[in-house]
Amino acid sequence: MTLFKHWQTLYINVNLATMTDGSESYGEISQGALAISAGKIAWLGKESDLPEHFSVTDEDIEVIDCKGQWLTPGLIDCHTHLVYGGNRANEFEMRLQGKSYQEIANAGGGIVSTVTATRRASEQELLASALPRLTALHQQGVTTVEIKSGYGLDTINEIKMLKVAGLLADELPVTIKRTFLGAHALPIEYKDNAEGYLDVVCEEMLPQVVSENLADAVDVFCEGIGFSLAQTKRVFDAAQSHDLPIKVHAEQLSNLGASELAANYNALSSDHIEFLDEAGIKAMKKSGMTAVLLPGAFYFLRETQLPPIELLRKHQVPMAVATDANPGTSPIHNIHLMLNMACTLFRLTPSEALAGITCYGAKALGLSESKGQLAVGYDADIALWNINQPAELCYQFGVNPLSRLIQNGQQVLMNESA
């Protein structure tokens, strides 16, 4: 029996894009209704199927007439680097003038410049600079964000970054998942001693991160310009010893087999994956991993190798989409632009792209049992959009159609102009 007397809020006259795992056409329910109780979705379906004897005039329930708008799950950005010091606009200009990556690095640019600026910044300075980036995503309907470390590259500053990521949750009603990315690059003081740096990552940084409960997962940048397969395995082993889930930056510039390696550890996701091959895809499917597509970096770096979308479809590997917001290769804080790029550059369908920032974004963070879908018992993180069909969220960007944003059942944003 549906105990509607315990409902706090009921949305009526609304179309639902439930985005349930494996659903087609957005999991649409037209002329629907959705009820919230204690921060969870308590009921959803056709408005005509509301429980018998229920009345929308019940004074104990807030009833919201959505006037035919669309409800989706709150959006999820499952791969970002939002916390960092400085910016690299000067390098952008240098690159457009024809300077090579090495020339920029020799001039003090590249990731070294971000590491230097991040180390110099205080927690409050990093918080102040990250907050507008997170605010931009939040105002676009994002309710869950993953934030990585990786610009400190020493124990004090990696810890500082993760603490700032946690503090952001006190500033905005957004769920923050933190990922330790100490193995992002070699700091200049270890430029000729990768194994020595990994000693610090695995034996000093990671135990402290765990002891202070600062991370939900561990990531590694496995690439020719990053860490080798053997070095990546070393970090994975350390993460596994601390019972932390694994993610990996993999197959962005070449195929080292990092996705296959990560699959052996039942990793959450493999991200970038432009050079992923079928063997890696099969391994990901077998272990239940998610493929995270990052079209912003593909665009900003003017890459030409497309991710193997057809093979991912063939083997039914879930595809998430994220901003990869970072100062060097994707200084983009617009989730709707990512939807459009996923469709136009990678040829995802709009329903695949939207699934990528809802149910499969949740899966990439290990949250598939609580977020990313409109389903009974799931967290009431939902977004109301003034659109005529869900594809509009992928079709256009620059105009924000968000009408209301609800986090854990509480309205946190309202845009009367939408």
Swiss-Prot record:
Its EC number is 3.5.2.7. Its cofactor is Zn(2+); Fe(3+). Zn(2+) binds at H79, H81, H249, D324. Keywords: Cytoplasm, Histidine metabolism, Hydrolase, Iron, Metal-binding, Zinc. Fe(3+) binds at H79, H81, H249, D324. N-formimidoyl-L-glutamate binds at Y151, N326, G328. It is found in: Cytoplasm. This is Imidazolonepropionase.
